[in-house]
Amino acid sequence: PFHNGHLYHIEKAKELTGADRVIVIMSGDYVQRGTPAVLSKHSRAHMALLNGASVVLELPVCYSCASAEFFAKGAVSVLDGLGCIDALCFGSECGNLEHLTSIAHLLSAEPETYRHHLQSSLKNGMSFPAARCHALEKMTGDAYASQILSDPNNILGIEYLKALKKLNSPIVPFTLKREFS
């Protein structure tokens, strides 16, 4: 359901981007983990419209119930396909676009050294998320970079950035440090 964090995000996104309109993309009747939404999509859309959204679009269920990578790909594809979107503003725990972009570029490029560390970690029984963090830390020598990948909104933000890059989208990314739940 709509909460103070969403209101904060809409207000700060307008301020940060200079936008006078905000398009919100949200899950329909089923959310990312495939569970039914607590409130109907119509109720949630109505709340978003009452609190500053100009338009609410539904993310198709094949994306909304998928991994962060496909969720982001779907959302960015919808926005890019509209042909009139200048900015994408997403929340992240770190709030640092430069760090997120750097990681997104590395994960998109998948250099040989990174792939080697990833495969080695997977063969040693690590889960994919843990192996990815480990490979990133080995590749960059930076524990903070791998720590960024332990937070769900950072992960989603990185996936938005990867999708923008993959689509060669002119949409400019912005991130807000998450202050509310």
Predicted regions and their residues:
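Active-site cores that bind ATP or allylic diphosphates and position pyrophosphate for catalysis
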Residues: 58-181
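Receiver (REC) domain switch/active-site residues of two-component response regulators
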Residues: 20, 54, 86
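Non-catalytic positions within long, well-ordered alpha-helices that form the structural scaffold/packing
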Residues: 14-15, 49, 76, 80-81
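N-terminal catalytic cores of NTP/NDP-binding nucleotidyl/phosphoryl-transfer enzymes
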Residues: 1-44
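A glycine-rich helix N-cap at a beta->alpha junction
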Residues: 45-60
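Divalent metal-coordination and catalytic microenvironments
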Residues: 3, 48, 161
